[in-house]
Amino acid sequence: DLNAGFIDMDRFPFQYAWRRPGLYVVVIDASSANVDSFQRQWIETALNSTNRNPDDLCLVMGHLPLTAFSEGRARPGECIADPWGLADLLRRSRVDLVISGHHHAWYPSESMGLRLLSLGAMGSGPRRIIGSGVIAPPSLTLLEWSRASDLIRETTIDLNTMQSMTSDGLP
């Protein structure tokens, strides 16, 4: 029962916190570049909730990314405004992975002291990755985690070839 894990769903589906044993998820309303002070306060409260176990894997998900990953989206309004302020909040709150979309280019990275994952497009609209000129293929990402080892294993499948993608060719 998915509903059983909700911690805060007052603004569902735009903003909510959800927990299962070993996993704590915070979804932020990052549909526009401005994550205002009210939402930042909510994020801080959600991430520091007594419902969160310190051993939980913590994921934060939102539509717009903290930083640009694809060509044509590296401009104001296409990424979070004041990304360093939000990144500082996420670091202090011990977030394990920040997942975003919008840029339609699969790109796992570490930036601003955080582990970031930009999800690719599943259908039309994949974009070129900044610095490579390569158009990201349609893709699907699967996340697996082990509570015993605190590891997040990410597998991304190229939907054209159905083969696992690697970050070897990424800038």
PLM regions: where:
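Short, hydrophobic secondary-structure boundary micro-motifs
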Residues: 70, 87, 153-155
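Extended active-site neighborhood of metal-dependent phosphoesterases/phosphodiesterases
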Residues: 1-57, 77-97, 109-120, 124, ...
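Flexible, glycine-rich phosphate/dinucleotide-binding loops
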Residues: 34, 67-68, 125, 149, ...
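A short C-terminal boundary segment appended to hydrolase-like catalytic domains
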Residues: 141-171
